[in-house]
């Protein structure tokens, strides 16, 4: 087991335990607001473009967000089930955003020029998710940068920044990150 995988297993177990009380509130809220199903599965592309089913809490009905869904999406709580994807080895805690096949086709991210982006597992959080790039091309460059420069310290920093985004807000954290670049 690699260091990254050990970190992912420990982190996803901890995440599932920490968020269990939250899920005890979220699941009944989704049921009351809009009924079943609770979980939403969607086919995404993982490492080496292998498809997998990503898990999320369902937040939409007929293309519109539900009342509870708006809150879950705004807080990122709809992504808690992805700890199961991490535990099963389909995702990592940190990595590029998992994309759908239609996203990849729409963005034109196919062919050997884009292979480095797919050399790592997709993540619950990542460099592009935190930086919030201005364009898909910039997002791709951030994904490639992560894939090439990965190290345990980078993952730790990105996880810390993800927590900061959730506590302080994305705009404040992005200003702080931008000041580090200067």
Model-predicted regions and their roles:
Residues 24-28, 41-43, 80, 112-117, ...:
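Intrinsically disordered, low-complexity boundary segments flanking structured domains
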Residues 37-74, 124-142:
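Short, glycine-rich, amphipathic interfacial segments at transmembrane boundaries or analogous
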Residues 63-121, 159, 166:
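A short, structured surface patch at a secondary-structure boundary
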Residues 2-5, 64, 76-79, 152-155:
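An acidic site on a long C-lobe helix of protein kinase domains
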Residues 117, 122, 127-181:
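Cytosol-/stroma-facing membrane-proximal "stalk/adaptor" domains immediately downstream
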Residues 29, 42, 97, 106, ...:
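Juxtamembrane helix-loop transition sites at the ends of transmembrane segments
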Residues 1-61, 157-182:
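A hydrophobic, helix-centered structural microdomain
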């Amino acid at each position: 087991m690699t260091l990254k995988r050990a970190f992912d297993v420990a982190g996803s177990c901890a995440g599932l335990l920490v968020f269990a009380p939250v899920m005890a509130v979220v699941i009944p809220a989704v049921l009351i607001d809009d009924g079943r199903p609770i979980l939403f599965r969607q086919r995404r592309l993982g490492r080496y473009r292998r498809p997998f089913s990503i898990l999320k809490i369902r937040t939409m009905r007929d293309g519109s967000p539900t009342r509870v869904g708006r809150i879950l999406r705004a807080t990122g709580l709809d992504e808690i089930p992805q700890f199961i994807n991490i535990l099963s080895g389909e995702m990592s805690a940190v990595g590029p955003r998992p994309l759908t096949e239609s996203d990849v086709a729409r963005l034109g991210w196919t062919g050997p020029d884009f292979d480095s982006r797919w050399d790592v597992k997709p993540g619950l959080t990542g460099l592009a998710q935190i930086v919030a790039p201005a364009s898909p091309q910039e997002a791709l460059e951030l994904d490639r940068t992560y894939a090439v420069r990965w190290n345990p310290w980078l993952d730790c920093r990105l996880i810390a920044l993800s927590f900061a985004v959730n506590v302080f807000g994305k705009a404040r954290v992005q200003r702080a990150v931008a000041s580090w670049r200067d």
